[in-house]
Amino acid sequence: MSDSNPLGALIPNREDMRCCEGDASAEISHAQLDSITDAVRHQYGALAKRAAERASSSTKASDRFYTEEQRYTLTDEAVGASAGCGNPVGIADINLGETVLDLGSGGGIDCFLAAREVGETGYVVGIDMTPEMLDLARTNAEKLQTGNIVFKLGHIESIPQEDNSVDLVISNCVIALSDKKGRVFSEIFRILKPGGRFVISDVVTD
């Protein structure tokens, strides 16, 4: 697990995620998964608050994954709220005029970088389930005077976006936290235009 991600202990192992037989076991399993989702939301909400107060900064991660030029164009709060494990924008080969959607957009760091790549004729959508992160991202957008981004409240397992409407989906160390990864990928394919693509930076394990 990348040391930039504050939620390593919250990712369930295979034993926790096993399919169970019987209603009682299934109910316990669902309760565990609900607890994980709540914990993820709580931890990222706390990270957003610390970043807004500039009491926390993921500079170690941002130094490793983002260039000095990229960091210079962002707010301190956007960098401080980053809990990613890579830089999907750096390898996505984004084109002018494209529509890009970021799953688990957090404080908006990858959205802001993507917005520069798509230009004024393009559009970026950030999806996050944490209200505090959405508030921070929208504040960052105002500070950066970025007009081609919208941030939406939603879950990556049920993306609030129209079918066949996105050229590129990106995600940075978020899908690993979902217990319904198959549904996430189905949603990605649903919203992608024909010939669309997705670029994901994430944690994997055998």
Predicted feature locations:
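Conserved SAM/SAH-binding beta-strand->alpha-helix loop
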Residues: 130-132
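N-terminal auxiliary segments of SAM/dcSAM-dependent transferases
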Residues: 2-64
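Conserved alpha-helix/loop element of class I SAM-dependent methyltransferases that forms part
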Residues: 60-99, 110-113, 117
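A short SAM/SAH-binding and catalytic strip from SAM-dependent methyltransferases
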Residues: 167-180
